[in-house]
């Protein structure tokens, strides 16, 4: 599982070092895809393949679901960590997420999110009240 917030830098070649504590959990291979709220989502490859297959099976008759699966599949980029624990973030993904040199990598329980640092700060500030107030339905699953 993935927890925590880290602030690695994107280098000039578009490489990003993932936190050491996430590397073992990612195992052999990972998938980088467009995420929600202009972030990137990083999944262990095996987990992503299970989720993608499930999503594809459910989407055959629903136009919105088909569009989601198409976008997900089209944005999927298979990666392997290099010897220094880095991934190469494609230009398409950097543009989508607005990534600059300053990035934020967060654990989101069963996957990782990569954000532009400024975008993450804006998102966090905008949603702080939502978190503080809590949602009874969401809290009930945690407490």
UniProtKB/Swiss-Prot annotation:
Any one Gene Ontology BP term: negative regulation of DNA-templated transcription initiation
GO cellular component: cytoplasm; nucleoid
CDD domains: MraZ_C, MraZ_N
Main localization of the protein described in the UniProt heading: cytoplasm
Limits of the SpoVT-AbrB domain: 5-47, 76-119
Keyword line: Cytoplasm, DNA-binding, Repeat, Transcription, Transcription regulation
Cell compartment(s), UniProt: Cytoplasm, Nucleoid
Gene3D superfamilies, per the entry: Transcriptional regulator MraZ domain (3.40.1550.20)
GO molecular-function term, one example from the UniProt record: DNA-binding transcription factor activity
Assigned protein family: Belongs to the MraZ family.
Subunit composition and interactions: Forms oligomers.
Protein name (database record): Transcriptional regulator MraZ
Organism from which the protein derives: Corynebacterium jeikeium (strain K411)
Higher taxonomy: Bacteria, Bacillati, Actinomycetota, Actinomycetes, Mycobacteriales
């Amino acid at each position: 599982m993935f927890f925590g917030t880290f602030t690695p830098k994107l280098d000039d070649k578009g490489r990003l070092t993932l936190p050491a504590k996430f590397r073992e959990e990612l195992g052999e291979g990972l998938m980088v895809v467009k995420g929600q709220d202009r972030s990137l989502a990083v999944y262990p490859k095996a987990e992503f393949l299970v989720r993608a297959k499930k999503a594809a099976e459910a989407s055959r008759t629903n136009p919105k679901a088909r569009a989601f699966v198409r976008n997900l599949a089209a944005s999927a980029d298979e990666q392997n960590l290099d010897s220094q624990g880095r991934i190469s973030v494609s230009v398409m993904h950097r543009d989508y997420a607005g990534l600059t040199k300053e990035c934020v990598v967060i654990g989101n329980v069963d996957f990782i999110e990569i954000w532009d640092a400024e975008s993450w700060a804006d998102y966090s500030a905008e949603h702080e009240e939502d978190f503080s107030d809590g949602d009874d339905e969401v809290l009930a699953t945690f407490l």
